[in-house]
């Protein structure tokens, strides 16, 4: 529970809202995995043995992969926005409008 509170405080902006969709996904993924990891440890009597620890590895691996996917998505979105802002100066107005509509439709379909 402490890790969830820490992640929530790290991902909130000044208004107390989650700063981005990817951060929200990461927060939910971490909370879900931490609860399932704790349930896996507390529900099994043999969980403190090496076999119980080995059974918990897929849960931890899933958490790490999910968080890495969220972070990679966040970096890709940031890079695409920066490149889009840089390229606006070199594109005529008509193509600029088409590009803006394309990006808006892309994010609507993506989410």
From Swiss-Prot:
What keywords would UniProt list here? Membrane, Transmembrane, Transmembrane helix
- Any one cellular component term from GO for this entry? membrane
The answer to keyword Membrane applying to this record is: yes
Is Membrane one of the keywords UniProt gives this record?
A: yes
Residues crossing the lipid bilayer are 22-42, 48-68, 75-95
User: What is the topology of this protein in the membrane according to its UniProt annotation?
Assistant: Multi-pass membrane protein
**Further details from the record:** Partially overlaps PGD1.
| Descriptive protein name | Putative uncharacterized protein YGL024W
Organism name? Saccharomyces cerevisiae (strain ATCC 204508 / S288c)
